[in-house]
Amino acid sequence: MLMSSKAQKALIIATPELISVRDADMTVSKLEGLHFDEIYLIINKISVEMVKSGEMMSIDDIINIVAVPLIGAIPDEKSVIHSNNIGKPVVLKTRSRAGMAYANIAKRLTGVKVPILEDEKKRFFRFGRK
């Protein structure tokens, strides 16, 4: 007898650009229609400076549009590009904020309670509010 199984969790990865956020919102609607149990949001390439200057949507703005729980935000930093170019995962760079963000997302996905870092809260959540 063949058993049918479906994924129970879905990760939506969006960048802080309007088209990406709109696509993420549409994808969430489709996944909800398929009765996914858990849908989480990862925001990739977030720039504190651009959020602060009003050039980029804030994390709060994105969460309000997509309306699913945030499981992590990956800062846009040079270490990611450098790691890609030398073929080493950024998660191995323990001092990299992006590496730490990836590691924390992995922990959260496996059920480990990892709070959003205080530094992340200060730098990402505070900026972008008007």
What are these regions (language model features)?
Residues 1-72, 76, 82:
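Conserved catalytic-core segment of NTP-binding enzymes
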Residues 21, 73, 91, 113-117:
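Secondary-structure transition/capping residues
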Residues 39, 95, 117-120:
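Residue-level detector of alpha-helical recognition elements and their boundaries
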Residues 84-100:
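C-terminal boundary of histidine-terminating zinc-finger modules
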Residues 95-115:
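Histidine-centered active-site loop/cap adjacent to the catalytic His
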Residues 104-108, 117-130:
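A short, charged, Gly/Pro-tolerant segment at domain boundaries
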